[in-house]
């Protein structure tokens, strides 16, 4: 089984979807802790898109010299079989922002 790490950017096939859920094959950020990633067949992800507006639950960052957005308001858990490729790790500054937005949005 492939090992996936928290804050790793991966390509995920999100189809099939319903309604306003983000769809198709796209980059996603793994946000579940490594302990969960190691022991379960699922990971929790935030989809990434290059087409978004500024919004409090969306964080911009550069990926392949293109501005992309981590869509924290569409966080969800997926089976690892949906992952098709590992791209790399999110930068430290963006990780700090992701943690803060997740805490602000879901913990308080």
Where are the predicted features?
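Conserved functional hotspots at enzyme active or ligand-binding sites that engage polyanionic ligands
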Residues: 1-108
């Amino acid at each position: 089984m492939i090992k996936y790490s928290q804050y790793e950017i991966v390509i995920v096939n999100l189809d099939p979807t319903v309604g306003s859920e983000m769809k198709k094959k796209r980059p996603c950020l793994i946000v579940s802790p490594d302990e969960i990633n190691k022991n379960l067949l699922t990971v929790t992800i935030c989809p990434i898109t290059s087409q978004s507006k500024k919004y409090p639950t969306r964080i911009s960052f550069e990926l392949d010299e293109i501005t992309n957005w981590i869509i924290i308001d569409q966080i969800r858990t997926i089976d690892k079989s949906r992952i098709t490729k590992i791209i790399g790790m999110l930068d430290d500054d963006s990780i700090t922002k992701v943690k803060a937005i997740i805490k602000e949005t879901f913990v308080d």
